[in-house]
Amino acid sequence: MQVLHVCSEMFPLLKTGGLADVIGALPAAQIADGVDARVLLPAFPDIRRGVTDAQVVSRRDTFAGHITLLFGHYNGVGIYLIDAPHLYDRPGSPYHDTNLFAYTDNVLRFALLGWVGAEMASGLDPFWRPDVVHAHDWHAGLAPAYLAARGRPAKSVFTVHNLAYQGMFYAHHMNDIQLPWSFFNIHGLEFNGQISFLKAGLYYADHITAVSPTYAREITEPQFAYGMEGLLQQRHREGRLSGVLNGVDEKIWSPETDLLLASRYTRDTLEDKAENKRQLQIAMGLKVDDKVPLFAVVSRLTSQKGLDLVLEALPGLLEQGGQLALLGAGDPVLQEGFLAAAAEYPGQVGVQIGYHEAFSHRIMGGADVILVPSRFEPCGLTQLYGLKYGTLPLVRRTGGLADTVSDCSLENLADGVASGFVFEDSNAWSLLRAIRRAFVLWSRASLWRFVQRQAMAMDFSWQVAAKSYRELYYRLK
């Protein structure tokens, strides 16, 4: 079974979000599971520099100009690169300029990505041809459409990492991307009078996956579907929509081997976690005290992530004696709000604006509770890292958060399945009630340690996801 992942980023070569983490880990897990998985990426500068052994496979003149297809390896995974400097050789973000305006030629830049993905199934590399083209998010959404236009030389899977980003472009660009105008149809890639790369992936793929079972159900509902609910409900009825949970890359996220921690530990040596907490309290300007629970946030500061709820609930958390360490950036109003809280509550609130991958490990190793109060969350990786590190997740019941965290209810504690704290409603009162439950459990140290060990024993490895995808691919053949 030969599978080509078509996508726009891959950790650690280039990362703007969780998609990169998935592509950085899933193909390697699939190779270990017996699938010949490779990755197709645009040759953005950081990616091109990272794949040092790239050799020319093919040269083509395309609707988007001349391209060179390269092939090399990164961490044991075969990587195809679309080398087109006029499209991809730009500093900074792969999607927008320094003023945060989307590049005006994004329609060509990402149509080309889908086109090359489909051409791979027609022999662009004469020595390797995929049985399945697995496209990820809107950037690769045209790959299933190009395959359909070519008579489907390979099966296609389209994975939705976040339905909110739809890849919308003016209709006249149909003239530029070499797809038949007949595809510009409500039964095709047309959406609200425009081309939607996302809808192209949803409509033309043989199978759609979402990054958690709950999110796969949620996106059939109007409040989560952004206008795509009719199509997604149809795909669900046809058995062509399912959810596969993302995993944790244990080579990077494991408290037993994490060199970024002051003190490494396992579920059997959790007492060694205390030194990480002490170091984190010092680094964030918090009072060094192992008797108080340290809550943490590692997140984009947006209302989608529920960070406005944290700001509203913060006085209640602090009144009970808790501390907060926050690492993130985003909405300027939220940034100012958290900075003001740090100034008002010195020793109890520490805030670092920005994102630093290394420091996020130190927070995960040192905190007692990781807050993930998202309004919607397709899968979420932060809570999975929390489980792995014995940093109990406090989450809202949505998307992948609902699939991965079991509340510390009396029943779950008795059954030995509790792993965190879950609240229902997207408001500060509901969040505060969950925070209160965390304080109650914290006051029972042996029970807290029991839940930590239970959380750390859960298996969210990429091997589980790789097996699920392998079974899906074989069903499509």
UniProtKB/Swiss-Prot annotation:
Write out the catalysed reaction: [(1->4)-alpha-D-glucosyl](n) + ADP-alpha-D-glucose = [(1->4)-alpha-D-glucosyl](n+1) + ADP + H(+)
Keyword entries, A-Z: Glycogen biosynthesis, Glycosyltransferase, Transferase
Assigned EC number: 2.4.1.21
User: This protein's superkingdom?
Assistant: Bacteria
Instruction: List, alphabetically, the GO terms of the cellular component aspect.
Output: cytosol
Fetch the CDD domains from UniProt.
GT5_Glycogen_synthase_DULL1-like (cd03791)
In Gene Ontology terms, what is a biological process of this protein?
A: glycogen biosynthetic process
Sample GO molecular function, one term? alpha-1,4-glucan glucosyltransferase (UDP-glucose donor) activity
Main EC class the enzyme belongs to? transferase
The record's InterPro entries line, in alphabetical order, gives:
Glyco_trans_1 (IPR001296), GS/SS (IPR011835), Starch_synth_cat_dom (IPR013534)
- Positions bound to ADP-alpha-D-glucose: 15
Q: Which pathway does the UniProt entry assign to this protein? A: Glycan biosynthesis; glycogen biosynthesis
Coiled-coil intervals, chain numbering = none
Give the matching Pfam families.
Glyco_transf_5, Glycos_transf_1
**Protein family:** Belongs to the glycosyltransferase 1 family. Bacterial/plant glycogen synthase subfamily.
Function of the protein = Synthesizes alpha-1,4-glucan chains using ADP-glucose.
Q: Which PANTHER family match?
A: ALPHA AMYLASE DOMAIN-CONTAINING PROTEIN (PTHR45825:SF11), GRANULE-BOUND STARCH SYNTHASE 1, CHLOROPLASTIC/AMYLOPLASTIC (PTHR45825)
Instruction: Give the protein's recorded name.
Output: Glycogen synthase
What species is this protein from? Shigella boydii serotype 4 (strain Sb227)
